[in-house]
Amino acid sequence: MSDIEKVVMRTRTIEKLLRTQYHAEGKGLHQLITSCEERLPRDVVAKLRFIATVRNKVVHEEDYKLDDRKGFLAACDACEKELTPRSSR
């Protein structure tokens, strides 16, 4: 799976969690985060911002390379775990 595919798939999951569990609103991931950031821990917001920035660069910048794939995936894992309701874990 290419970096673009992996990034898009992971961010779609996070977007869905933000919309369904936190009633986030907006077009992009940054807007979704902004709409519900008061209800999220600061460390999660920081990770989400990192994820959103990487996603935008991967999708919109032709020459962007995902240098820290492991770090990106770890941030996604941490955010998905934090955003998933405890009863669903």
Regions found by a protein language model. Give the residues of each.
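Amphipathic alpha-helical interface elements
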Residues: M1-T53, H60-R89
